[in-house]
Amino acid sequence: MKRIHKSVVFFACLLLGFTSCQQEKKLPRIGIAGISIECSTFSPATSDEAAFRVKEREDLLDSYPFFAQDSVLRTKAEWFPARVSSATPGGIVTREAYESITKKTLDMLKENLPYDGLYLDIHGAMSVQGLEDPEGDFLQRVRDVVGYETIISTSMDLHGNVSHRLAKN
């Protein structure tokens, strides 16, 4: 009985020792990127790369009100803002513009690999010459860069198109 009592006391002390040790918690690494435009396929105009406003790195992070300098959210992760290109509603995006914007975005995402999570700021109503599912294509290319271990989350307009390819990635 005395032996069991000593074992229980020893185990309790050991357990308290482990639980009282404060280990520095590793923050998740989260990237930010995106392409956002609402296209009208009825418009005769096209949207080229010059139609997009680009925000990168800290300017991108500062552009979101929920990431204000004094925001608690800003301290909950290691943020790696890459690039978001956004345009006002316009005509279909030229294939050249899409390929260029996508390449620049992916190149910036590669700079800080690996990520635990990735926030993609997309609209969901982009049309690109020669592509049936531009957001799905973009997400697939992003997934090819960040891998399948990274959680990808998107925000999009309420009427955005969620294709199977987009949802799968």
Predicted regions and their residues:
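Bacterial N-terminal signal peptides that target proteins for export
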Residues: 1-8
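Bacterial Sec-dependent signal peptides at the C-terminal "C-region" and cleavage site
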Residues: 12-26
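N-terminal amphipathic/basic leader segments beginning at the initiator methionine
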Residues: 25-72
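Active-site histidine-anchored catalytic micro-motif
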Residues: 31, 36-38, 95-102, 110-169
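Surface-exposed loop and adjacent secondary-structure segments within mature catalytic domains
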Residues: 37, 48-50, 75-77, 81-84, ...
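Glycine-/proline-rich flexible loop or hinge segments
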Residues: 51-57, 83-92, 123-124
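A structural motif corresponding to the C-terminal end of an alpha-helix
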Residues: 68-80, 145-148
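Low-complexity, highly charged intrinsically disordered N-terminal segments
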Residues: 74-80, 84-97, 101-108
